[in-house]
């Protein structure tokens, strides 16, 4: 996760993170990705059930019951373990997490244990009453998925009227005083909608926007051919960055992030190096602290059946099950080959990634996407859009 707005506009500095000694337990949410101890943010797919049928859903969720999902007692035990382990954030996802009957029991326990609870939702089930419950039952932030305006969004979601319901959910959150943001997964099918979605943020006074690059997981694997090419990705990043700077000049406060393509960090650095050279060294320091892709380190996933994965896009790769061992024990067990390999990935990744001058701020990008595209977990990520000239050492990191 890369904060374009804070890095481009200079609203975060190295000193901000150092004041908290870069400890996950002490850092405020916007500085967590600069932590030194890298306690994992846990994406918890508490159910796989969902009333929509999104074409890019990494969980391949559907509107049916899934046998074997964790019981309330088991889930509360997971939360106790995560709290003891010092996990800073639990991100409730799905499926549609609001379809789990005990969701608010779980979120309340997360809050009572001193952790931050975040909700990832399609927004269609958020009525004014539900929004008030979200606020009262422990959630500090709600991310609502939008893939464009009505026609495009409804096609992506497989349901007519989904856009209207999601917008109603966003408005209900705002009216209830819940911090809410938009999550937009960009592909060739909806890249033309990006300007309109950014205008919508202004119209609806939504303070946060996350642009996700397509991960080839679940149903997303079937539309991998719709992932943006290098020039399309660069245009999207330029458009988004220009909008961030324009909002900043106007005094409009929006937090804008990109997710799941860590080449964005290098592309952002190169722009700052050209346009704000006096800030380049500090931005590079922050990007190195961020460290790029954190699968198996600073992010982990627990699925609806209790399987632990390196991230939410790697459901085919299990590290263990919380019904057999606590998450904390699994996460610290470097005898698990995959876990050790991900944390020592620099020695395993090959191709142009291996010699990239930006490896320490990208960390080889998204391994799940590389494996889906090539069958090799350690191959270069095909979503990297940097040129050979841009990644060449040592010129890449000259300031």
Language model segments and positions:
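N-terminal pre-core extensions flanking Radical SAM catalytic domains
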Residues: 1-61, 80-83, 327
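Short Fe-S-cluster ligation motifs
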Residues: 79-94, 341, 379-399
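Radical SAM/AdoMet-radical enzyme domain recognition
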Residues: 67, 72-93, 99-235
């Amino acid at each position: 996760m890369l904060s374009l707005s804070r890095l481009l506009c200079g609203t975060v500095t190295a000193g901000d993170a150092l004041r908290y000694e870069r400890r996950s337990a002490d850092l405020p949410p916007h500085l967590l990705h600069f932590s030194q101890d890298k306690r994992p943010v846990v994406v918890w797919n508490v159910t796989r059930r969902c009333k929509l049928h999104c074409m890019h859903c990494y969980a391949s969720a559907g509107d049916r019951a899934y046998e074997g999902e964790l019981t309330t007692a088991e889930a509360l035990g997971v939360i106790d373990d995560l709290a003891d382990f010092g996990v800073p954030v639990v991100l409730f996802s799905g499926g549609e997490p609001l379809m789990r009957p005990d969701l608010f029991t779980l979120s309340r326990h997360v809050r009572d244990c001193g952790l931050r609870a975040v909700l990832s939702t399609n927004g269609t089930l958020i009525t004014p009453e539900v929004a008030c419950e979200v606020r009262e039952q422990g959630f500090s932030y709600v991310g609502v998925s939008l893939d464009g305006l009505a026609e495009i969004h409804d096609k992506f979601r497989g349901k007519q009227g989904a856009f209207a319901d999601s917008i109603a959910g966003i408005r209900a959150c705002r009216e209830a005083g819940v911090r809410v943001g938009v999550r937009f997964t960009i592909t060739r099918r909806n890249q033309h909608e990006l300007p309109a979605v950014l205008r919508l943020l202004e119209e609806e006074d939504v303070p946060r926007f996350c642009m996700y690059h397509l991960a080839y997981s679940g149903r997303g694997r079937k539309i991998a051919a719709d992932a943006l090419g290098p020039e399309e990705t660069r245009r999207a990043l330029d458009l988004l960055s220009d909008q961030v700077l324009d909002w900043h000049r106007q005094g409009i406060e929006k937090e804008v992030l990109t997710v799941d393509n860590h080449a964005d960090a290098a592309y952002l650095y190169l722009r700052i190096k050209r346009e704000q050279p006096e800030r380049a060294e500090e931005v590079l320091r922050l990007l190195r602290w961020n460290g790029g892709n954190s699968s198996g380190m600073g992010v982990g996933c627990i699925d609806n059946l209790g399987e632990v994965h390196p991230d939410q896009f790697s459901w085919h790769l299990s590290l263990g099950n919380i019904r057999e061992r606590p998450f904390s024990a699994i996460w610290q067990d470097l005898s698990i080959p995959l876990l050790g390999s991900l944390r020592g990935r620099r020695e395993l990744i090959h191709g142009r990634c291996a010699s990239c001058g930006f490896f320490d701020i990208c960390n080889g990008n998204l391994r799940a996407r590389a494996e889906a595209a090539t069958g090799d977990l350690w191959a270069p990520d095909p979503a990297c859009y940097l040129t050979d000239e841009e990644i060449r050492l040592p010129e890449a990191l000259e300031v």
